[in-house]
Regions:
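Short, well-ordered coil/turn segments that N-cap beta-strands
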Residues: 127, 158-160, 206-208
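Cationic, amphipathic, low-complexity alpha-helical segments enriched
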Residues: 194, 199-209
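Aromatic-lined carbohydrate-binding/catalytic grooves of carbohydrate-active enzymes
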Residues: 153-198
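Short proline/glycine-enriched turn/loop motifs at strand-loop junctions of beta-rich domains
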Residues: 33-39
Length: 209
């Protein structure tokens, strides 16, 4: 299997990385800490089949596999893990879940989104007017994009900062966000990962700047 140094990512670039890790275009490393199972297999959905990739276990309980040589992995590809040849389980460190936290996960290429937050300076403490926002109830749509459309109204009210209630992936359709299960993934009923990134940037550009 080919491997290389990880490319730059926003906002982190740690050496030890849970979940899918982009090593080079089309080449990804999958990491799971699971000390109890004897075997772990990566299952990757292709057009007409599910391809299996056995993972290598280290002495400290990490299972790892790097794939891409036999077919590039792309943004949005679906995957999960098979434990000891019997039980299919989602990635607890997935960046996106296809349906809910019990099913397939989706690869998220953070390089797909162009961050332009270099000008962000923050707001002086004395100038803070904070609006606490729950994405699901802030608009009729209940989505990240729906929230973006109403940001000008907050600016007109004098709001200078937005505090978003927790958006970690939860089971079910309705949730306040305080019992998130997929802690590395943004709630998919509000939209896709690029939508949540867009909301972050629009808040910075419309409210904070």
């Amino acid at each position: 299997m080919k491997s290389s140094q990880p490319v730059s990512r926003h906002p982190n670039n740690e050496e030890d990385f849970f979940g899918p890790r982009k090593m080079a275009p089309g080449i990804w490393q999958f990491n799971v800490w699971a000390p109890k199972p004897n075997d772990l297999t990566l299952l990757l959905k292709r057009t007409n089949e599910v391809v299996q990739f056995p993972m290598e276990k280290s002495a400290d309980g990490f299972f790892t596999v790097t794939v891409g040589d036999d077919g590039a992995i792309n943004h949005g590809d679906q995957y999960c893990f098979c434990i000891d040849g019997q039980n299919n389980r989602p990635d607890v460190a997935a960046r996106c879940y296809v349906d809910d936290v019990h099913g397939w996960c989706s690869v998220v290429d953070q390089d797909q989104y162009c961050w332009n937050d270099d000008r962000w300076q923050g707001v002086a403490k004395d100038d803070l007017v904070i609006y606490e926002m729950h994405i699901g109830t802030f608009t009729q749509a209940g989505t990240y994009l729906g929230a973006i459309e109403r940001l000008p109204e907050l600016v007109a009210l004098g709001v200078t900062a937005v505090e978003i209630l927790p958006i970690a992936q939860t089971p079910g359709r309705w949730n306040w966000g305080y019992d998130g299960v997929g802690l590395f993934a943004a709630e998919n009923t509000y939209g896709r990962p690029t939508n949540s990134s867009s909301l972050s940037m629009r808040v910075i550009n419309k409210v904070w700047l």
